[in-house]
Amino acid sequence: MSQPDGAAAPQVDGASAPGRKSAVNRERLKRSQKSSKVEGPEPVPAEASLSAEQGTMTEVKVKTEVPDDYIQEVIWQGEAKEEKAGGKDSTGDVPAEICVVIGGVRNQQTLDGKAPEGSPHGGSVRSRYSGTWIFDQALKYASGSYECGICGKKYKYYNCFQTHVRAHRDTEATSGEGVSQSNNFRYTCDICGKKYKYYSCFQEHRDLHAVDVFSVEGAPENRADPFDQGVVATDEVKEEPPEPFQKIGPKTGNYTCEFCGKQYKYYTPYQEHVALHAPISTAPGWEPPEDPDTGSECSHPEVTPSPRFVAAKTQSNQSGKKAPASVVRCTSLLHRTPPATQTQTFRAPNSGSPASKAAAAENTFSRRVESKAQNHFEETNSSSQNSSEPYTCGACGIQFQFYSNLLEHMQSHAADNENNITSNQSRSPPAAVEEKWKPQAQRNSANNTTTSGLTPNSVIPEKERQNIAERLLRVMCADLGALSVVSGKEFLKLAQTLVDSGARYGAFSVTEILGNFNTLALKHLPRMYNQVKVKVTCALGSNACLGIGVTCHSQSVGPDSCYILTAYQAEGNHIKSYVLGVKGADIRDSGDLVHHWVQNVLSEFVMSEIRTVYVTDCRVSTSAFSKAGMCLRCSACALNSVVQSVLSKRTLQARSMHEVIELLNVCEDLAGSTGLAKETFGSLEETSPPPCWNSVTDSLLLVHERYEQICEFYSRAKKMNLIQSLNKHLLSNLAAILTPVKQAVIELSNESQPTLQLVLPTYVRLEKLFTAKANDAGTVSKLCHLFLEALKENFKVHPAHKVAMILDPQQKLRPVPPYQHEEIISKVCELINEVKESWAEEADFEPAAKKARSATGEHPAAQEEDRLGKNEVYDYLQEPLFQATPDLFQYWSCVTQKHTKLAKLAFWLLAVPAVGARSGCVNMCEQALLIKRRRLLSPEDMNKLMFLKSNML
């Protein structure tokens, strides 16, 4: 080493005795550096106590040359040590090395600019961060604390003292002439270029980048110490090729994914989204590409750090000269556990070699940094949970109330990405394989065409066709339900996939290669379930409306029954439904148990804060669901209850209506006789009623509709006794009452159009019908009085029904009498006020003080908002009625700018169905109960299979 001549440390003004003592220590340090050059490279132990906090970290002794402007700081550190030791002098000879404490990211960049001596930029960083004389004057270490010499404040930890002194230095710097205010942002990140004014903020930002990357250049003995990390200055970092995932866009905070084009406002969700494009597993023979600029590569791609962290590592050669820093960036995407072979390589018997020690140290440090990042992520989520903040998915932006649901959702993204990668790989077989079988197939095709005279589309011989047909017949005979499956497109796709696989990889035995098909399907059932679950979650979470409709309906098949949970929302001009879960019903299930099951399933797909309207049947108690949102009753179930309560044998016997009981029995016998099924005579309506409609009513209406055909049939069969016992007059009167009821049920169960706005008009229409028929004499009058009582008791009209009726521009307030107009308008305004907070765009962050100030002026603003909402409702009601039946969603899409609040309310309420049961519920319940009785699948697998059946196709 060469000693600089004429170097003098700055002296402190007004310090006589301490100045002489500092000069003696400085001369002693210079002599020790000269002697270290003669004595040899063996290090001499030295003690350095910077602070109580740094003392717990790993100490690495680095031989280096110390510039003169650094000597003064070493002197006051030695003085503090001597003062703490009670004036006891140190050893006779000053050590030739300087102990640099490394072991945390906070030690890589200090306030005064010192960097580890292995870093080639230590001098430049020092020259940038060394300020005025304030730092040298400020420190007074006494009685275990650091005292500021400027203002007298005391600090226990050295880092806190540094931050305080920096404030004095910044104040002096900004008070001078020619100093720009932008110089306060002096801490610049060398990874992404962001600038920070305060060191603590800069340090937290560096924690997101910092991770040790072990360089593989050179021999093991030439490798640098794995803990020798330096901070690379911004102006001295070599230009590198852009990373595969980088910030694209202006400086306004727009981050665009270059794979799928999604845009993010914040960098962290963008990073998490980009990580999802990474392959889940790395091929065994994969090696990272070499960097053309730095020539460095990642030694172990399976143990590459997370893309959240990027590290800069410096190296020194054996000659002691400072080599240029090489910034090593690992291009792998996800942190993966190394395979067993690599784990054994890391634990080689030759653990005493420099290479094994360096590798072990590197792995230890990487694990520590990864663990620190994971703990930081968990603490962040824990704090957000304590503050009642939702967990947000960085890939799609969906929010979850519980952290476990977020983890499961992220695994679904990973499974979806894995499936896309594997499917793409399977669709593109190697070219060599195609060259092997394609010419052969063409040759066989040509031979068959020329020899047997078959067309190119009939290359299979007739004998093979007969064999295939025989196998198909065996499958059909084994299960009659396979008749529609074999001719379906999914079975054809399966057969084509088997043929293509055999063509690619040669003829093979399906049983030997694929094994049991049921086992194969169940093995991949969770992966397929997660893929479809991600799509359903994204569809429900990205809903432009601020609410959904949820139906929980029980369907009975014989003695068994099950619950089906379905979510509805408006997507464009259509209503989209998603079956979320299927659960077997039990007699012991109460309303609270069903409610808990519904809430648990919904928490996996949507946030609990989302506005929800529940539609349940008569078996589910509405009291439990009313706590979570508005709860309505299925309109078909309500009308069915009306009919059953009136036409039940117990009620008719109590009212002495024996002729009605006899009529119902005769109609049921006629409809159930051999050859007189419903399919024989047809039905009056093309659209079938929902599965929760009463079958007794259908029998009566069927006999009335096809009375002439039934009489002709029985006259030929010479069985006129049943026809003679039929009361034709009473049958006609009952049909006149029940036909409008069934027609209303069919209208309310329409699956392609909004139906909630029809509930109140249906109630008014049926009430008028029963009132008019009640004035007649005889049995019909008694029945109509019973129907009126049952209608008021079972067919409830809720405020949501009234609001939905107003949202129909063809009806508005026309179906109801004028004295109810003000009541319905007030209900509309109340519902708008309840959900208007959800419509407002929330700010990213609002301080508590600002919220407190805004609370004082909330009352006048709320009154103004209520007035505007009521004026909007009156303006809408003054518009003329539509003469033709409009498409409601298309109408509200056109008037969104004119009636903003009503339009948002319409896209929520009009998507809620009036009837909870659908036409496909019966088939789904039959299959679910069949699986349950035969014990083919577990309840969990059965639920996943039903979910796939409903949402995948």
UniProtKB/Swiss-Prot annotation:
SUPFAM superfamilies recorded: beta-beta-alpha zinc fingers, Hermes dimerisation domain, Ribonuclease H-like
Q: Recorded GO terms, molecular function?
A: chromatin-protein adaptor activity; DNA binding; identical protein binding; transcription coregulator binding; zinc ion binding
Q: Which residues carry this modification: N-acetylmethionine?
A: M1
Output compositional bias ranges, type Polar residues: 339-354, 419-428, 441-458
Localization per record? Nucleus; Chromosome
Zn-finger segments (C2H2-type): 146-168, 187-209, 255-277, 391-413
Q: Where is the composition biased (Basic and acidic residues)?
A: 365-379
Q: Give disulfide pairs as residue numbers.
A: none
Q: Which protein, by its recorded name, is this? A: Zinc finger protein 618
Which species does this protein come from?
Mus musculus (Mouse)
This protein's encoding gene: Znf618
